[in-house]
Amino acid sequence: MDSFHVMQWLIHSIDMFLRNLQKEYKARDESTRCEIFSKYGHQHRINISDEVYLLKKYRWLLLANQEHLEYHLEPRYDRHFRFFINTFGYEEKFLALHPYIKDFRDLKEEYVRFNSRNAGNPLKAAEEIDYLIHKYCSSEHHIFVQFGNLLRKYKNPIINSFIMVDRLGPDGIYNSRLSNGPIESLNRKVKDLKRLGRGFRNFEHMRNRFLFATRRNPIY
């Protein structure tokens, strides 16, 4: 369990919460449409609600790391709202969609900061992770209770993922955190080769194809 997969689990869980919330608002809007139909006896087009619009187009305000968000100060015209609005305005409206959303962002960002500042310092990460586990497991939000249990279960692998190692890339040696990404990438190449070849009956032939496809120095 490395840094990427920990964050992937958390972002996926929050995203599922937002998608379910969007379904609830869509169901509410459909109920309103049906009420209008039963009252007036004809179909009536209802514009997409503010809540569904924000959840469809601006989930990234919660899912993206805050340090990566680009806020534009100059208001831009929004055709749905029919007025000028900037990123801060969208953020304010998005956070007001549900009482949990601001808490989710604060709790997520706390782990993001922990993950960033301890790169290359596994001893410090080991000291801080216990506090996070306790905080998340004591949370009133089920998503973060589960997240705390995940951190507890994979505590040692997560701490080890803060170790920095030298890697060889196209531009030479660079420093990077321990990750199972490289081996997953290699496994994916094997699967792609098998899929493109529609299977192989001869292992030696497949092995040679794989070694040739993953060679570092091209043959001219």
Question: Where are the predicted features?
Answer:
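Acidic/histidine-rich catalytic cores and adjacent linkers
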Residues: 7, 27-220
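Inter-helix linker motif
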Residues: 1-12
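Short, surface-exposed amphipathic charged segments that create phosphate/polyanion-binding patches used
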Residues: 11-23
